[in-house]
Amino acid sequence: MKNSFSEYNPKSKDEIENLWKKAIFIFDSNILLNLYRYSEETSTQFIQIISELNNRVWLPFQVGLEFNRNRLTVISDQKKNYTVFEKKLNDLIEEVENKNRNPFFSKSLLEKLSIVKDEVKSEIEAKIKVYDDSITSDSILEKINLTFENKVGVNFSEEEIIKIHKDGEKRFKNRMPPGYCDSKKPENEKYGDLILWKQIIQKSKDSKVDVLFISDDRKEDWWLDHQGKTISPRPELIKEFRTETSKDIYFYKPFQFLEYSNEFLNSEIKEDIIEEVKSYKPDLFKNDNFIQLNLTLQGSIEDFNALFNEMKNTGYNILKESNSVNDFHYLNIFLPNIPDLERRLNSKYISKLSNYNLNLIDIKKS
C-alpha cells in the first residue's frame, strides 16, 4: 500500500540521505529575507551553508523577484523594531525614575539603571546604523548575489503567466495547493506561490533532478497540519510533483535544514543558532489588535449561507468561501483581540453549529 500512497508516508532514513546526496536545494524568498531578521551570527552561519552547497543551489525567478521587492521593507521593519524597543525602554526608565509616586527605588539602583540604559541605548543606535547603512551598502545582499550568481531561473513568458493565473482560479476554488491562502491578495500578488511552484516543477523536469525546498512559509497550503502540529508537506504537492517530473521532492523548514545540514553536510551549527531560527516568528503572524478564526464547515450551501448572513447582520467581520464538490465551506472571522468577544462567538455560534445543520471539521486561530 505504501507504494500507492507514498506521498502520505514519512520518508525512511535512507530516502532522506539519498535526497541530501543528490537533490538540488531551492530556497524560498522568506529564507533569504529572514537573513535580515536573525542575529548577525545566525545570519552569517546560514548563508555560509547555502554558499557551500555551490552548484547544488538554484533560485527560481519568482523567489529573486519577491526577495528584491521586499528587501528594503524588511530592513525598515527591523530598524523599526529597535526604535519601538527604545521608546518602550525610555518610557519604563521614566516611570522608574519618577520620584513623586510609587514605586520608589534607591538612589544606588537608579544609578545602576542609568548605566544600563546608556549601554542599551548605545547598542540600539549601533544596530539602527547598521540597518541605515544596509540601504546603500548591504553585505547580506552581496553574499546572496555572489551565492546565486548564474544560478537564477528565467521568468515565464506573459502567455505562460496568463495561463497559470487561469489555472490558479480553478485550483483556488477547489482549495488545491499551493497559493489558495493568498486568494484575497491583489490580483498581481495572489498567484505568486503558484508561479513559484510551477517554476520548481519546470526546473526539475528540465534538469532531471530531485528537489529539496526550504521555506519558512507557514500556511496550510504548503504544509499538512494536524491538531496544530506540522506533519509533512501537503501530499497533493508531493504527488503532483512526482506525476509531472518523475522525480522526488521534500520540504524543510529553516531550522530542519540546519539540523540535517549537521547530519548530512558535516556542518557544525550550534544548538543555540538552530533554536533561534526555530523560535523566530515573522511579524506578519503577530498582530496585537485582532485575532482571526478560520473555520472549516460541512453541510448544505443553503444552511451555510443562512449562518453567514445571520453573523454578517449581527456585525461580525467575516469572509466566506465554498466548495460545491464536497460541501465544505470556509469561514474567516476577524475579531478585536478582546477575550470576551471570542467567548461570546463560541457560545452563540461555534458551539451551536448543529442548530444550523453544519458540522465543524476544523478550526484554526491566528
Predicted feature locations:
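Conserved short beta-strand edge segments in small beta-sheet-based binding/regulatory domains
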Residues: 317-322, 350-366
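Helix N-cap motif at beta-to-alpha junctions
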Residues: 300-301, 334-342
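A generic structural motif
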Residues: 325-337
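Active-site-proximal, substrate-binding regions of enzyme catalytic domains
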Residues: 2-211, 218-285
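Short glycine-/aliphatic-rich beta-strand segments at the starts of folded cytosolic domains
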Residues: 286-299
